């Protein structure tokens, strides 16, 4: 891991001291070199180079998931977020940032047609992607069935769903599903859900950005459960 910076400032001095305590190598380079490394992205004069942890294979993750579900049996409340083919890494990063702030227990993504952990996700999430527990599955419907066996109720965001303000949520184990930026949630997943919910809006366009919707739905569900 390397801490790379362009010029000294009170902020870089503070970060440099922190880097030293963590035995992180410090490298000073000029502006052009930093622009080239970061492909001219807004870097505020410094950067951290690190290696992202590789995802476990799906088979290993499935076993970990089952073990995790066993631990949820001992918890009074649990909240899992499932993302059905969220493809934009900036949306994924923003969702992970929200998930971290609201202490979501697990974020599940699909193996295919989903954004992967990368530098864009890390940056958009402001580092939250490194704190959120995540796993990948091949089939969300199979995952839903497993969650139901462990007492989870499935809530899915859908434009034709019930107004979330007009339903009473009192389930202790919640799984919230959000869908692809363009297509939304797959039909079979909606059919396998316990509730379809929507956010009431009054604008001229018909939907919110998926990362915004995620934050609003998580907040409202947690508010109703007195978990804020």
UniProtKB/Swiss-Prot annotation:
The alphabetical list of record keywords is: Methyltransferase, Transferase
Q: Which SUPFAM superfamilies match?
A: alpha/beta knot
- A Pfam family name for this chain? SpoU_methylase
Provide one Gene Ontology biological process annotation. methylation
Recorded GO molecular functions are:
RNA binding; RNA methyltransferase activity
Show which residues constitute the signal peptide. none
* Enzyme Commission no: 2.1.1.-
Residues that hold S-adenosyl-L-methionine according to the record? 179, 199, 208
Q: What Gene Ontology cellular-component terms does the record carry?
A: cytosol
Family from the record: Belongs to the class IV-like SAM-binding methyltransferase superfamily. RNA methyltransferase TrmH family.
NCBIfam families noted in UniProt? rRNA_methyl_3
- Tell me which PANTHER family the record gives: 23S RRNA (GUANOSINE-2'-O-)-METHYLTRANSFERASE RLMB
Give the protein's recorded name. Answer: Uncharacterized tRNA/rRNA methyltransferase BB_0516
């Amino acid at each position: 891991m390397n801490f790379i910076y362009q010029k000294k400032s009170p902020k870089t001095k503070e970060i440099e001291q922190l880097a030293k305590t963590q035995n992180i190598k410090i490298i000073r380079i000029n502006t052009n070199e930093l622009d080239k490394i970061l492909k001219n992205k807004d870097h505020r004069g410094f950067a951290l180079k690190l290696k992202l942890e590789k995802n476990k294979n799906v088979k290993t993750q499935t076993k970990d998931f089952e073990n995790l579900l066993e631990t949820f049996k001992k918890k009074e409340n649990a909240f899992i977020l499932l993302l059905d083919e969220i493809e934009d890494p900036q949306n994924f990063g923003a969702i992970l940032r929200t998930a971290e702030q609201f202490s979501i227990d697990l974020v599940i993504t699909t193996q295919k047609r989903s954004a992967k952990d990368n530098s864009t996700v890390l940056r958009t999430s402001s580092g939250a992607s490194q704190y959120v527990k995540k796993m990948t599955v091949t089939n969300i419907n199979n995952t839903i069935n497993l969650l139901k066996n462990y007492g989870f109720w499935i809530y899915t965001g859908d434009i034709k769903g019930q107004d979330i303000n007009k339903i009473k949520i009192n389930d202790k184990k919640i799984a919230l599903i959000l869908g692809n930026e363009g297509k939304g949630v797959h039909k079979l997943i909606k059919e396998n859900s316990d509730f379809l919910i929507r956010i009431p809006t009054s604008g001229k366009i018909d939907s919110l950005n998926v990362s915004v919707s995620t934050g609003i739905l998580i907040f409202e569900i947690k508010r109703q459960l007195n978990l804020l």
